[in-house]
């Protein structure tokens, strides 16, 4: 849908509920509800909690296509220094600030102790911080030539724990979507830091679901404020 189609569809669908008194929204309010609906739908699709789609992001090609426009790849060999890790083998890398969900990640190990395996790719395994003590010395769960552990400490920083030197970190991730902003917003107004018009970047097949959820959010919000029900 174009932004005009989103706006017109929002008004039409909202009016079809026959709510009294009628709910009237400006373009900023519509944009806010559409953006919130988009973000909720992405989380539901990724996790598999959405009852319409039923499966999570990695389970079917169809579901992966719904979010394919948000998939980004990031690679870095620049380590962040001056950070105190939970292990003597900790190393830190910055990750993009728009990272929502990491879907694939590997570390490239470059260490003379690896011999002919120098330069090998190791899977990066996310680990809750309270599991680190139990996992770090476990041969099946701890760091090895095939496995590097990752702890998340900030939204833009990853702590990797490896027995060997990590030369490079590669990840593929679902990025935070740009907000759906129907028109350029007046001075002082923004959504997720953006104030200029921007269209939905998701696969068009989910646009209708975003619109319907946005209208539901608007009805819930407005009826709670006025005390009216459908």
Curated annotation (Swiss-Prot):
Sequence intervals crossing the membrane: none
One GO location term (cellular component): virion component
Source domain of life: Viruses
Keyword annotations of the record: Virion
Subcellular location: Virion
Free-text function comment from the UniProt entry: Forms the tail multi-ring barrel with ring protein 1, ring protein 2 and ring protein 4.
Note, other: The barrel is composed of five stacked dodecameric ring structures. Podoviridae-like phages usually possess only one such ring. The tail is thus rather long.
Self-association state and partner proteins as the record states: Homododecamer.
Protein name, per record: Ring protein 3
């Amino acid at each position: 849908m174009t932004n005009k189609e989103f706006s017109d569809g929002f008004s039409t669908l909202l009016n079809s509920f026959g709510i009294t008194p009628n709910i009237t929204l400006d373009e900023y309010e519509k944009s806010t509800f559409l953006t919130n609906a988009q973000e909720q739908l992405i989380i539901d699709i990724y996790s598999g909690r959405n009852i319409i789609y039923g499966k999570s992001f990695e389970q079917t090609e169809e579901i992966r296509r719904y979010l394919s426009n948000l998939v980004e790849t990031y690679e870095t060999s620049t380590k962040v220094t001056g950070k105190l890790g939970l292990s003597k083998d900790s190393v830190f890398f910055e990750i993009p600030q728009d990272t929502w969900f990491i879907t694939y990640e590997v570390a490239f190990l470059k260490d003379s102790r690896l011999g002919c395996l120098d330069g090998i790719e190791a899977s990066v395994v996310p680990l809750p911080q309270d599991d680190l003590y139990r996992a770090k010395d476990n041969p099946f769960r701890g760091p090895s030539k095939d496995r590097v552990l990752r702890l998340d400490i900030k939204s833009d920083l990853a702590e990797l724990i490896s027995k060997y030197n990590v030369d490079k970190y590669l990840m593929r991730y679902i990025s935070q979507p740009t907000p759906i902003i129907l028109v350029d917003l007046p001075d002082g107004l923004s959504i997720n830091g953006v104030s200029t018009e921007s269209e939905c970047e998701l696969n068009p097949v989910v646009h209708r679901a975003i619109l319907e959820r946005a209208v539901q959010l608007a009805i819930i919000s407005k009826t709670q404020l006025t005390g009216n029900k459908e």
